[in-house]
């Protein structure tokens, strides 16, 4: 076998192995960013929008007469409904609004519909023979909410040539559970425009 043929025979596999090794050794850099910084990667719903909505809505609701009455009203929070054409984690919006309201210290929260199964399962578990009856939570002790917070997020998307305009609107309402009266309502609007080119 000639030296040239042997060299050709091993050259391609050696070249592929070297390329794979070089790709595997490529340096990957990870850095921390400011979680509160403005996110401008895309014009889709993002972390900046989530923070702005939660803070704005909580600030507004904490000024509502039903809340400032001073008796720490009990609120249940329904998951914000997504009426946009894109996937938006509305549970994250709902949880962020609840967290901002909780920080305000003016409301208490009753278990919501999504958490009811876990709550009743825990009560049933404590009713088993494995728990001390004197310390176990009894059925019929849960507190009902005085108010129900609910809402939705909608969007309008327009495209013209290299311009994409996205308008989001989040609307929340606080309903009195006892009498069905609307106690508070507000909305937060966000507009994002992207130009290609």
Model regions and ranges:
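Bacterial Sec signal peptide processing site at the extreme N-terminus
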Residues: 19-44, 196-197
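N-proximal, solvent-exposed amphipathic alpha-helical segments enriched in charged/polar residues
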Residues: 44-62
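Amphipathic beta-strand/beta-sheet edge segments enriched in Tyr/Trp
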Residues: 26-29, 146-196
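Sec-dependent bacterial lipoprotein signal peptides
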Residues: 1-25
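A short, acidic, amphipathic alpha-helical segment used as a generic capping/interface helix at domain edges
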Residues: 131-139
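Surface-exposed acidic, glycine-flexible loop patches that form ligand/cofactor-binding
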Residues: 64-69, 139, 160-162
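N-terminal segment of the mature soluble domain
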Residues: 56, 60-132, 179-185
